[in-house]
């Protein structure tokens, strides 16, 4: 037995220092690979392969699972000390082949770099060339697109990582397919948004009778509990949708920092006009988006959307001044989200 004495403090002797916390506690500000993974899971038949330690994948998947309450497939090369010293190219090649063998419907693999693999200088483009030769030899009847996504987390954030992954995947697939016949559709890049935002955007385009491809289509991340529901959740954006982006009537970039770079890429490479408008939060930003759609497509804004706008204005006129008059707000979030919410606060 130890001779140590145990001192028991009485409740009156315990002093607690109160801490006043204002604003947001632990805001979500993740690294570039997290944003790249979110872009990847928005594509159907796609599994992002994170070239780095297991933690770079595990904690991001946990974040997505906690937020959406769904399961997502994200793979890791599980880099260890040996690979950090001698290079991890072999891990990439092994990982790609394992995924191709295990998932017969797999069509897209974004290979996402991390801090460690960028610091040691792994040649991802070289690994992709090796992997393509191996895939062609083992799976001659399949085409799997490998996209290099350079996202070191010692710079940027999940916002820039998302934009980089979208741009790289689109470049890889559209370069392979090239320009085809005009589709008359709109490309829509809403940026990092939630499933409900995608559903609302689809509602707007349906009411205006405009065909549009929304990239990335994450509507199923809030999928209902149906009898045939899959245990894994994937986005609805297909390889064919991405390839068809080169044939679109125009691109509507609703996110200056999260989707505009891909719109600029399509404009430069395939002469698809790119229109940049703010994310449609609030009355003014939504008006700007609908006017731009009408301008590009030649369609008129329908009476149904005019009525919805009137209902929103009536609600603001009835209630907004009671709760928001002479109030100050602090907004923290994604750049495009902040721009949209700031405009909405000005309106109310």
From Swiss-Prot:
<feature type="binding site">
    <location>
        <position position="153"/>
    </location>
    <ligand>
        <name>[8Fe-7S] cluster</name>
    </ligand>
</feature>
<dbReference type="InterPro" id="IPR000318">
    <property type="entry name" value="Nase_comp1_CS"/>
</dbReference>
<keyword id="KW-0547">Nucleotide-binding</keyword>
<keyword id="KW-0479">Metal-binding</keyword>
<dbReference type="GO" id="GO:0016163">
    <property type="term" value="F:nitrogenase activity"/>
</dbReference>
<protein>
    <recommendedName>
        <fullName>Nitrogenase vanadium-iron protein beta chain</fullName>
        <ecNumber>1.18.6.1</ecNumber>
    </recommendedName>
</protein>
<dbReference type="GO" id="GO:0009399">
    <property type="term" value="P:nitrogen fixation"/>
</dbReference>
<dbReference type="GO" id="GO:0051536">
    <property type="term" value="F:iron-sulfur cluster binding"/>
</dbReference>
<keyword id="KW-0067">ATP-binding</keyword>
<keyword id="KW-0535">Nitrogen fixation</keyword>
<comment type="similarity">
    <text>Belongs to the NifD/NifK/NifE/NifN family.</text>
</comment>
<feature type="binding site">
    <location>
        <position position="56"/>
    </location>
    <ligand>
        <name>[8Fe-7S] cluster</name>
    </ligand>
</feature>
<feature type="binding site">
    <location>
        <position position="115"/>
    </location>
    <ligand>
        <name>[8Fe-7S] cluster</name>
    </ligand>
</feature>
<keyword id="KW-0560">Oxidoreductase</keyword>
<dbReference type="GO" id="GO:0005524">
    <property type="term" value="F:ATP binding"/>
</dbReference>
<keyword id="KW-0411">Iron-sulfur</keyword>
<dbReference type="Pfam" id="PF00148">
    <property type="entry name" value="Oxidored_nitro"/>
</dbReference>
<dbReference type="InterPro" id="IPR000510">
    <property type="entry name" value="Nase/OxRdtase_comp1"/>
</dbReference>
<comment type="subunit">
    <text>Hexamer of two alpha, two beta, and two delta chains.</text>
</comment>
<dbReference type="InterPro" id="IPR050152">
    <property type="entry name" value="ChlB/BchB/BchZ"/>
</dbReference>
<dbReference type="GO" id="GO:0046872">
    <property type="term" value="F:metal ion binding"/>
</dbReference>
<feature type="binding site">
    <location>
        <position position="31"/>
    </location>
    <ligand>
        <name>[8Fe-7S] cluster</name>
    </ligand>
</feature>
<comment type="function">
    <text>This vanadium-iron protein is part of the nitrogenase complex that catalyzes the key enzymatic reactions in nitrogen fixation.</text>
</comment>
<keyword id="KW-0408">Iron</keyword>
